[in-house]
Amino acid sequence: MRTSSFLDRLIGEVDSALRTLVLPQKRITTRQSPAENLADTVLSAQEKKHISGLMRVNHAGEVCAQALYQGQALTARLTHIKEQMASAAAEEVDHLAWCEERLYELGSKPSLLNPIWYCGSVLLGALAGLAGDKISLGFVAETERQVTAHLQRHLHYLPEKDKKTIAILKRMQEDEEHHAHTAMEAGAVELPYIIKQLMNAVSKLMTQSSYYI
């Protein structure tokens, strides 16, 4: 049986990048959106603008997560780690689709900065993979913990009547917590404090800019 080469994985990464960044009319998912059967809520123009900003940030975060997983899968050493990264990336596609659909419903669109975040995250993921699978998994765990924390903050910022967005974020939060737990069980090591702070600083830059652009 032929094993995939680095070139094969690189071609797959280019394909994944195009699938992530080129917005389809409707993205194919493996799961139904948590908001699918919920009724629309009457929102003011200001509320729509604010919710759109939050969902644009969440969508950008999922673009980063997708890229991080793809970069790590590109350089991971162990087969089961590569498979775990690919599985997590597939779930992030669902998140992308849910965020995109909600943005369109609100009359908005994803961040124009997504290509920048994607490229940076792929590079970070690939470097983490080169540093070793345990460190790579540590990046996954820490990334997912930070994503979970900002999703929790967004849940507090949303109007209580916006049941659709709340349902989406809660399901995403559950998935991210599961990804972090799975990474730790697979042998992730805790990252140094300075690395965590650097990741947090980059995350803040992404969230503050993607909210508006």
Swiss-Prot record:
GO terms for biological process: ubiquinone biosynthetic process. It catalyses: a 5-methoxy-2-methyl-3-(all-trans-polyprenyl)benzene-1,4-diol + AH2 + O2 = a 3-demethylubiquinol + A + H2O. Pathway: Cofactor biosynthesis; ubiquinone biosynthesis. Its cofactor is Fe cation. Keywords: Cell membrane, Iron, Membrane, Metal-binding, Monooxygenase, Oxidoreductase, Ubiquinone biosynthesis. Fe cation 1 binds at residues 62, 92, 95, 176. It is an enzyme of class 1 (oxidoreductase). The keyword Hydrolase does not apply. Coiled coil: none annotated. Its main location: membrane. InterPro entries: COQ7_proteobact (IPR047809), Ferritin-like (IPR012347), Ferritin-like_SF (IPR009078), Ubq_synth_Coq7 (IPR011566). HAMAP family: COQ7. Catalyzes the hydroxylation of 2-nonaprenyl-3-methyl-6-methoxy-1,4-benzoquinol during ubiquinone biosynthesis. Belongs to the COQ7 family. This is 3-demethoxyubiquinol 3-hydroxylase. It comes from Legionella pneumophila (strain Corby). The gene is coq7.
